[in-house]
Amino acid sequence: MAWMTYISNWFEQDDWYEGLQRANMSQVRQVGLLAAGCQPWNKDVCAASGDRFAYCATLAIYIYQLDHRYNEFKLHAIMSEHKKTITAISWCPHNPDLFASGSTDNLVIIWNVAEQKVIAKLDSTKGIPASLSWCWNAEDVVAFVSHRGPLFIWTISGPDSGVIVHKDAHSFLSDICMFRWHTHQKGKVVFGHIDGSLSIFHPGNKNQKHVLRPESLEGTDEEDPVTALEWDPLSTDYLLVVNLHYGIRLVDSESLSCITTFNLPSAAASVQCLAWVPSAPGMFITGDSQVGVLRIWNVSRTTPIDNLKLKKTGFHCLHVLNSPPRKKFSVQSPTKNHYTSSTSEAVPPPTLTQNQAFSLPPGHAVCCFLDGGVGLYDMGAKKWDFLRDLGHVETIFDCKFKPDDPNLLATASFDGTIKVWDINTLTAVYTSPGNEGVIYSLSWAPGGLNCIAGGTSRNGAFIWNVQKGKIIQRFNEHGTNGIFCIAWSHKDSKRIATCSSDGFCIIRTIDGKVLHKYKHPAAVFGCDWSQNNKDMIATGCEDTNVRVYYVATSSDQPLKVFSGHTAKVFHVKWSPLREGILCSGSDDGTVRIWDYTQDACINILNGHTAPVRGLMWNTEIPYLLISGSWDYTIKVWDTREGTCVDTVYDHGADVYGLTCHPSRPFTMASCSRDSTVRLWSLTALVTPVQINILADRSWEEIIGNTDYAIEPGTPPLLCGKVSRDIRQEIEKLTANSQVKKLRWFSECLSPPGGSDNLWNLVAVIKGQDDSLLPQNYCKGIMHLKHLIKFRTSEAQELTTVKMSKFGGGIGVPAKEERLKEAAEIHLRLGQIQRYCELMVELGEWDKALSIAPGVSVKYWKKLMQRRADQLIQEDKDDVIPYCIAIGDVKKLVHFFMSRGQLKEALLVAQAACEGNMQPLHVSVPKGASYSDDIYKEDFNELLHKVSKELAEWYFQDGRAVLAACCHLAIDNIELAMAYLIRGNELELAVCVGTVLGESAAPATHYALELLARKCMMISVCFPCVGYSVPFCYVNRNLAADLLLMIPDNELHLIKLCAFYPGCTEEINDLHDKCKLPTVEECMQLAETARADDNIFETVKYYLLSQEPEKALPIGISFVKEYISSSDWTLDTIYPVLDLLSYIRTEKLLLHTCTEARNELLILCGYIGALLAIRRQYQSIVPALYEYTSQLLKRREVSVPLKIEYLSEELDAWRACTQSTNRSLEDSPYTPPSDSQRMIYATLLKRLKEESLKGIIGPDYVTGSNLPSHSDIHISCLTGLKIQGPVFFLEDGKSAISLNDALMWAKVNPFSPLGTGIRLNPF
């Protein structure tokens, strides 16, 4: 296996624990990502290959990949190697993992998508690579061209590597818009020019330069640029060309003649882009430039076959993907009889749209629009598979939450717009009118005024009224100088400050009256109003100084000047919790903390390697400060000692803005030059507070005052307004205050993405009155008893909109005329069924169905079913009414599920359960009566199936909380809890489980057990914050408190006490708290149990004594003896092994324990593999077997396990479970052999059932699918790149995914490095 090469040296040595670090993971977790839109500047900015497509923002390329299980595309990676505008992208035709991209800094990059790294780079090209393309006839050759040429050919590797100039393609008379290689004819290439002409080069033929200009331009020097150009994939000589004004032509490159000129329906329409449809010969699609109309054409017709309006804004570029095969249902087609009787079934033609005889080919078009919108349109089904309506296409300089709504985030961008996003759905809610130049900074009006002030590079400042959608005020005091920062005073809503490159910080009222102009010796970059004094403002200046001004006096001199930075100061920020404290970030790479009252710099934070931009104080923890830098990182600081607590590497470029909302103080948003906005959860930084809340500790251990909290070594305490407000509200309550406390703190500490939704559902289940549900409840996942009610009222509100259809039909063939005549005769003869079948043959289903009841209701129903089957076969939405009319709920639900429309499926299944759909009782087999209850039963099962599928979809997308919501919505509490635990949302699981009570108890207890394991290591989680020893002791107590919340807790408490490494006195204290005998008594109890030959008790008490290592040989020999017998089961040996694994780490690592330790690791590895099979942790089963085999091979041990047997067992498991593990494109299925079946059957006999049903299946933490990007790690378990959160092992180098770490730790407590150190990723 790949991973062994990484860590095999661990298995060689026996002194590996020397110099080990602590295993760790980032405390700051990425929980949301808002991708940029597609840039509108350059032509070839979207591309596709196989099951991936990509598009370019200005500085980053976004790559989406098909998830075969759900048949949907997901963001897979972000490439941000370019530092200047990207000009073009081209996918390699020979290798689906490679693409080439160019940028305006004369750079071409070859990037490998699978490995997410640069394969080759061509620097300082002659001229800007404005257009580029892989050569079709050579493996690794890329051609690129600047605006005027020549064409450069770059051979990337091999003996001929280097750049040469194409021998003919140079000295053009007009700039090049684009060029295209012929896909079959070697070396044939066409260029489109700004003057409307084409140049064609074909080796061995005469070169044709500047030919085929549109006829209207002949003899003039007017320009009509070529906007699109594509060779016909089925011809050697034909190509489609589009000119901006002249439109579309099909031309012949050999005879240099125009074959067809295509006509658009109106003179106003013009085409922006085009693409051939590979699955339909002769068919192509175009996108209009003014409005988002997609037109479908066939070369045989000069007018479009169909016109689909997809969006208000015009197209920018198009690319057609060959669709992946859909999951289809098998529907039996009618048997084809050799003779035709009056009642035999007709074979219908494919359905035709109203106006023409054609069916859209299967295929997906990647559509990019001028407003940055990107979508994937399914042409066959005529629906969006995915659409991101609009996005920033450039660097985002600033982001801020709306003061009165933590769900709305505003962003300001280089692209000249401010956009407001709903962070729960990551969709744009409002966008400013635009054309403002570059917007560097924004500031919300205080309270609910619903206005945003923006500062721009050339056009002064403005106020945008978000609701009205218009600019209501402009400020031009700085002239055309750039405004780097704008700050609306939150204590006095009439004042706005701006600072500019002209050296002034100007304070004015919102109606434009200037109050102060503070002159600085150089440009001013940052300003911030004090949170405690409405008249104090601080500025950051290019002269390296920070100044503080007092606005209440008329003086224009600063009160204080702080010097110390060695380069320009950018942002300054006042602490919200500590009066007189402010911080500043500088180009010298440091952050300085200043104390206004002491006139001094009280701390310097060193760590960034480039200028610092974003700065943010936490609004609850007074010493927590976060900074973002041009070194692409975000750093979290404890300003008490000036230590860096965490560094986040996920952004792919400079980090500019950081923000959080006081009512969600541990959710942070960041924005960057990589043109993404990312959401982060900082909750892990305050884990002790969270657990104090769960354990119902006193308020003193949750909320504190600032002076106490900033003492070094103090555990984190909440000191902000929000926590104080919650406390006040709770102290007012008389009843169920614990429930409210858990809910309110949970909502404050959890990131967006479903926790509010989850709590609403918990309230519904606990019987809360519907009138208390919040306004937005119906937007989320509703409890099923509300689903139909809310959807019905929604339907009444919606009014119908008439859609206009473009006309155009084809003459009807003669055969159809004859059939119609025949049908009329049959009808007059009373042969209704024959008439109906002929109508079916003509495709006139509606006529057939309207007459069919004249034959019989049974025949009508059968005809309806045939129609439904045909529509499903063709994947048409029209099937829905047919299925509903005949009550065929199952077919409809399966249809929706196969298309991934899980929410639709859920709605139908619920309607059926509520009895809104009547199955037609037509004919019943003799003696059987199908009661309504049985139908109800059927529908209920269907409902659960759909809910489960929807939950699974959310879950594998890294949205465990929403997955839990799906289960709560149908009252499935057990599964809802299981999904929270599998998503590692342990604190949330305990909160919700505590409120839900009895029905959630088993899962709540398991979550408490895992949380206690987390607590056991909290001092390890915070190695850098320097918590003192008493704090570690506090955490042992905290773990004990959690375990005491579990009714049957003795064994859990024993494990906790066994693992605790203190002095005897501390250990006895803990024993006392856990109601266990003292260390000395345990020693005697162990000796007694040993004399009685009671293995479990002996092991238990030795572990609790001063000499826990005595337990090892006793426990291990018991397990070895058991495994040697043939009929052992997991449940007999696992309890002993599990207990042994809690031996104190420093005792286990003693040299005298080497052999026992190695045997314990091997047994835990093997039993871990079996547990992983039982829990269906497919991704780590092979690694656990491999780990056990490696230890067996490399360590001196005598264990009744053979490497050969382990590999047979693994092969048997693979063979017998491959049908469930196979993904669509894997190798062909080979059935398991008889011996493999026998081995696997024995294995299953040993495993028995998992006691907690719901927790079977892999773990997926929140954000598992989000691409990180400057930070790529290879998993030492799989050898593959880790997507999502990473967990570093104790050597500080080896990494595994957090998901794998969680699953591993649940089945085998010891690290995969074989060191004997416990793994704690919780």
Curated annotation (Swiss-Prot):
Keywords: Repeat, WD repeat. It comes from Homo sapiens (Human). PROSITE patterns: WD_REPEATS_1, WD_REPEATS_2, WD_REPEATS_REGION. The keyword Magnesium does not apply. It comes from the Eukaryota. InterPro entries: G-protein_beta_WD-40_rep, Quinoprotein_ADH-like_sf, WD40/YVTN_repeat-like_dom_sf, WD40_repeat_CS, WD40_repeat_dom_sf, WD40_rpt. This is WD repeat-containing protein 17. WD repeats lie at residues 81-121, 123-164, 171-211, 221-261, 266-307, 391-431, 434-474, 478-518, 519-559, 564-604, 607-647, 650-690. Residues 330-345 have a biased composition (Polar residues). Gene3D superfamilies: YVTN repeat-like/Quinoprotein amine dehydrogenase. Residues 328-352 are annotated as: Disordered.
